Every structure is written in C-alpha cells, then in structure tokens.
C-alpha cells in the first residue's frame, strides 16, 4: 500500500502473487494497470473500507480482510450479488487496546457467526474464510503475543463450533505486520501483512 504499481511488478517477478491494498482508489488504479499483464495477481483489501466504496472493488477483489461491521458486511453482500460473485471475507476482531482500531469484539463475532448459520439467505454473496486482527501498537511483546493468541483461540473455537456454513473454507488467520509478524506467526497466523519490511517506508 502507498507504493507504485512498479513495486508490485518487481515483487511479482520475485514470486509474490498476493498483494494487499488499503485504499480503494489506489487498488483500482493498480488493478486496471496490471490486470492484463499479470492476470494471476490476487488482490486483498486490508484497510478501512467505507460502504460507499465497496462497489468499486466488488467486481474483482479476491478477498476483503477488513470487514469491521454488520453495515459493511451487508453492503459487501449487496454488491457481490449485484456483480454475481461470492466474495471471500475475513471478519476483523478488535483485540487491541487503542480505540482507533476497529472491528468486532469476540462476542460480536460469535453472535454474527450464529446469525449467518441461522439466516444464510441474508448473507448471500460472501464466504467466510477466517479472521483478521491488528495488535496493540506497543513495545510489550508479551501483550502483543497474547492478543494474537486470543484471536487464534477464537478462530479454533469457531472452527469447532459446528456453526460455520463452509468449515472447509474457514482457514485464514490474518495477523501480523512488518513490526510484529514473527509473533503472529508463532501464534498461528496464516496470512501476514508485510509492507515496509519489503518495500520500504510508505511514500
């Protein structure tokens, strides 16, 4: 994110295929520029997503990792149905201490998964593939590790709950960024969101 499409091309040539972007316009611009030359790039949306912007990425996005509210989820469902797609999503869990971080509490996640199980017709257009989380921005590695571990426990609880409509799809735990990804990997992350450690500081 915040890096030019040429950086994506370089990473692609090095073997990377999954790319995350956190701004809708930048994502659309990169997709339009690269889609013909690099049709196998897998685009994930990983940042705050406004409901009125979902329509711009619904036709091509491979996964929305940052579903943070029921209102946003409803709009993703609506736009996915509009374009005849099923969009893979992750539900973002709010475990960090900062109020600025967004997402569902663990109890809200449990309640939402139960609703999706009980009323699947309300959630057509999305497929639940797992959870996403951002840890607190602190130096205390023990605190960060415990936050990641708590999300992993919730992930495993949901996998064993019998409430997932497609349990075989519920495989992704996206947590960890450039500053804390080793801790996330130790706590079970399957996706890590590495930007500056590969591309340098944001432009």
PLM region descriptions:
Residues 189-203:
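Gly/Pro- and small hydrophobic-enriched strand-loop and loop-to-helix capping segments
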Residues 2-181, 185-187, 199:
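Conserved alpha/beta-domain cores
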């Amino acid at each position: 994110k915040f890096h030019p499409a040429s950086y994506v091309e370089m990473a692609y040539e090095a073997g990377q295929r999954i790319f995350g972007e956190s701004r809708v316009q930048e994502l659309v611009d990169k997709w339009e520029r690269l889609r013909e030359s690099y049709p196998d790039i897998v685009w994930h949306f990983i940042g705050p997503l406004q409901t009125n912007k979902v329509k711009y990425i619904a036709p091509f996005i491979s996964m929305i990792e940052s579903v943070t509210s029921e209102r946003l989820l409803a709009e993703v469902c609506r736009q996915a149905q509009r374009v005849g797609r099923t969009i893979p999503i992750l539900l973002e869990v709010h475990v960090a201490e900062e109020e600025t971080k967004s997402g569902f509490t663990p109890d809200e996640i449990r309640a939402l998964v139960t609703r999706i199980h009980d009323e699947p017709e309300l959630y057509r257009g999305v497929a639940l593939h797992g959870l996403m989380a951002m840890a607190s921005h602190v130096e205390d590695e023990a605190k960060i590790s415990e936050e990641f571990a708590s999300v992993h426990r919730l992930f495993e609880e949901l996998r064993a709950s019998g409430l997932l409509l497609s349990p075989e799809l519920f495989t992704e735990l996206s947590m960890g960024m450039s500053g804390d990804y080793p801790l996330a990997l130790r706590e079970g992350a399957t996706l890590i969101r590495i930007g500056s450690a590969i591309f340098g500081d944001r432009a």
